[in-house]
Amino acid sequence: MEGQRWLPLEANPEVTNQFLKQLGLHPNWQFVDVYGMDPELLSMVPRPVCAVLLLFPITEKYEVFRTEEEEKIKSQGQDVTPSVYFMKQTISNACGTIGLIHAIANNKNKMHFESGSTLKKFLEESASMSPDERARYLESYDAIPVTHETSAHEGQTEAPNIDEKVDLHFIALVHVDGHLYELDGRKPFPINHGETSDETLLEDAIEVCKKFMERDPDELRFNAIALSAA
């Protein structure tokens, strides 16, 4: 992806919550850490949960899987509800922001926005756009990149040089119309992972996260955060 490049966001609830606050989201939903994937640790996550963001490494194994998955879906097809808000990623390192947009856009009816919210405005103006049009609109939407840069510098680890190649990537896992969708701006379409509900979203999303980890057992760079009712 040549063209625009942003500083990467951390999978850090403090950073993501501050970012959403700057975008005009009322803190009635907040990101929290998912400390582990077994039932005992998942029980510590406040409920309800309306989205999970997974940060994972883009490895050779993953890229092989991604290509195979894409080809399989193209040949076999899949059901995707038109209610899913999905956008492509054309800006390098913007996957964290796009993950947040995917999480909020697909739960807009649960969110409270402050008056003049730049995120609400972006979602309203891009509602009828195609995934590619939304990507181009984000490139020209000045308010979000400025906020993103501020948040990238607020992380616990030092922000990398903007030209540095980053091999970590965010995806969002959300519940729309009874199904669990993986939303990844690097992919041509949402991935339907089967049935879910508001009550089981966290557990169902974590099952998908586990598959990412199983594909790369030598990798440790996985991190999940959940969007929970505050």
UniProtKB/Swiss-Prot annotation:
Region of interest: Interaction with ubiquitin: 8-13, 219-224
GO cellular component annotations of the record: cytoplasm
CDD domains on file: Peptidase_C12_UCH_L1_L3 (cd09616)
Catalytic activity: Thiol-dependent hydrolysis of ester, thioester, amide, peptide and isopeptide bonds formed by the C-terminal Gly of ubiquitin (a 76-residue protein attached to proteins as an intracellular targeting signal)
Modes of activity regulation: Inhibited by monoubiquitin and diubiquitin.
Location of the region described as Interaction with ubiquitin. Crossover loop which restricts access of large ubiquitin adducts to the active site in the Swiss-Prot/TrEMBL record: 152-159
Annotated site residues (Transition state stabilizer) in this chain: 89
UniProt cross-references to InterPro entries, sorted A to Z: Papain-like_cys_pep_sf, Peptidase_C12_UCH, Peptidase_C12_UCH_sf, UCH_AS
Record PTM Phosphoserine, positions in chain: 130
Highest taxon above the source species: Eukaryota
Molecular function GO labels: cysteine-type deubiquitinase activity
Domain UCH catalytic: 5-229
Annotated site location: Important for enzyme activity: 184
Keyword field: Cytoplasm, Hydrolase, Phosphoprotein, Protease, Thiol protease, Ubl conjugation pathway
UniProt-listed GO biological process terms: protein catabolic process; ubiquitin-dependent protein catabolic process
Family the entry assigns: Belongs to the peptidase C12 family.
Function: Deubiquitinating enzyme (DUB) that controls levels of cellular ubiquitin through processing of ubiquitin precursors and ubiquitinated proteins. Thiol protease that recognizes and hydrolyzes a peptide bond at the C-terminal glycine of either ubiquitin or NEDD8. Has a 10-fold preference for Arg and Lys at position P3, and exhibits a preference towards 'Lys-48'-linked ubiquitin chains. Deubiquitinates ENAC in apical compartments, thereby regulating apical membrane recycling.
Designated name of the protein: Ubiquitin carboxyl-terminal hydrolase isozyme L3
Organism: Sus scrofa
Gene name, Swiss-Prot/TrEMBL: UCHL3
